[in-house]
């Protein structure tokens, strides 16, 4: 038997079209100005999941170096004025800070999941720190 080319067909499944109100019908019949195509948008959560996968793969520092350096210097001024830092020292502080924050956010996420939520909240961070023994 010879193969035949299949043609595309419209799907027949799905919901039946509802009757439109008069205002909607009038709005639809009005001519649209130009063929302006609305920009493509991903479904909520898709981009977030893509970013999670991207940042879990990578090893680079996520906080910019100069803002972090300014923060370190600002905090250090409370203890002693005119302190100087080697660039390696600031790098080590940033590496440790980011590792701590990533771990804290992982624990925070587990606390939110335990509460049957997907959104982390301040109370999740407080619980994670309490369990770790960082805050009594």
Swiss-Prot record:
- Keywords per UniProt: Acetylation, Chromosome, DNA-binding, Methylation, Nucleosome core, Nucleus, Phosphoprotein
Q: What is the predominant subcellular site recorded for this chain? A: nucleus
Residues with PTM N6,N6-dimethyllysine: 5, 10, 28
| Xref: Pfam families | Histone
The record's subcellular location field reads:
Nucleus; Chromosome
User: As annotated in Swiss-Prot or TrEMBL, what is the tissue specificity of this protein?
Assistant: Highly expressed in all adult nuclei.
InterPro entries cross-referenced by the UniProt entry: Histone-fold, Histone_H2A/H2B/H3, Histone_H3/CENP-A
Q: Which residues, renumbered to this chain, carry the PTM Phosphoserine? A: 11, 29
Q: Where is this region: Disordered?
A: 1-43
Residue positions where N6-methyllysine is found in the record: 5, 28, 37, 80
Residues recorded with modification N6,N6,N6-trimethyllysine:
5, 10, 28, 37
List cellular component terms (GO).
nucleosome; nucleus
- Single Gene Ontology MF annotation: structural constituent of chromatin
Q: Which residues carry this modification: N6-acetyllysine?
A: 5, 10, 15, 24
Entry PTM: Acetylation is generally linked to gene activation. Methylation at Lys-5 is linked to gene activation. Methylation at Lys-10 is linked to gene repression.
**Can the keyword Translocase be found in this entry's annotation?**
no
Among its keywords, does the record have Chaperone? Answer: no
Under the heading PANTHER family, the entry gives: HISTONE H3
Q: How does it assemble?
A: The nucleosome is a histone octamer containing two molecules each of H2A, H2B, H3 and H4 assembled in one H3-H4 heterotetramer and two H2A-H2B heterodimers. The octamer wraps approximately 147 bp of DNA.
Role: Variant histone H3 which replaces conventional H3 in a wide range of nucleosomes in active genes. Constitutes the predominant form of histone H3 in non-dividing cells and is incorporated into chromatin independently of DNA synthesis. Deposited at sites of nucleosomal displacement throughout transcribed genes, suggesting that it represents an epigenetic imprint of transcriptionally active chromatin. Nucleosomes wrap and compact DNA into chromatin, limiting DNA accessibility to the cellular machineries which require DNA as a template.
Report the family membership: Belongs to the histone H3 family.
What protein am I looking at? Histone H3.3 type 1
The gene coding this protein: his-71
